[in-house]
């Protein structure tokens, strides 16, 4: 973790855990597959969080209660922040020390995926007449990138979890998603 992906040495890792490099290569194809295995539980936790949010938001759309999405957004953001802090070391590695790995673009890829998913949702809501304005996709992407930059900032600054949870209030004040998205 100290060295980050690019400066990590498989020999040094093997020495630290008492393995031979041959034993490591029997299980992992190389440094990137070892890195992927290290990240997997964290990525699964993030995906599960995202899937839960998606299910709930689509239920609001189906019921015609889009504005109810905003009722628990602070709690949702704090839940996400808790997940990030449950996996703090791995998240810091992934976000800030993954250069050279297949996940080096994660910090940019996540907001783009979130924007794409949100845009599909908005298109459906617009087609169904549940919203009367559709934000431009590129604007949404830029806003999502700014949002996730703010969400990841406590990890970048290595703040304690309580301070990160408190910062969620500021993030919510800064990002008026209901105003931007029109509901």
Give the positions of each predicted feature.
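Amphipathic alpha-helical packing segments from all-alpha helical-bundle domains
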Residues: 76-86, 101-127, 138-145
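Short helix/strand-capping hinge loops at secondary-structure junctions
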Residues: 1-8, 28
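Short hydrophobic/aromatic patch on the recognition helix
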Residues: 17-28
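Alpha-helical structural segments
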Residues: 2, 12, 16, 33-60, ...
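Hydrophobic/aromatic-rich alpha-helical bundle segments in the mid-to-C-terminal region
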Residues: 122-174, 183
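Amphipathic alpha-helical segments that line or abut small-molecule/effector binding pockets
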Residues: 63, 67-89, 141, 145, ...
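Short, hydrophobic secondary-structure boundary micro-motifs
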Residues: 92-94
């Amino acid at each position: 973790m100290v060295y980050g992906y690019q400066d990590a040495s498989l020999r040094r890792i093997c020495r630290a855990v008492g393995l031979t490099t041959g034993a490591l290569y029997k299980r992992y194809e190389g440094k990137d597959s070892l890195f992927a295995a290290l990240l997997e539980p964290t990525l699964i936790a993030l995906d599960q969080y995202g899937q839960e949010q998606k299910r709930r938001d689509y239920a609001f759309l189906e019921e015609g209660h889009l504005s109810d999405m905003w009722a628990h957004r602070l709690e949702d953001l704090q839940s996400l922040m808790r997940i990030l802090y449950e996996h703090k070391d791995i998240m810091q590695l992934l976000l800030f020390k993954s250069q050279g790995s297949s996940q080096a673009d994660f910090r940019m890829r996540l907001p783009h995926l979130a924007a794409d998913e949100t845009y599909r949702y908005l298109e459906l809501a617009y087609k169904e007449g549940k919203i009367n304005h559709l934000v431009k996709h590129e604007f949404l992407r830029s806003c999502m990138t700014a949002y996730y930059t703010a969400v990841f900032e406590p990890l970048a600054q290595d703040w304690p979890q309580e301070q990160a949870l408190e910062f969620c209030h500021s993030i919510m004040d800064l990002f008026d998603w209901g105003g931007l998205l029109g509901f």
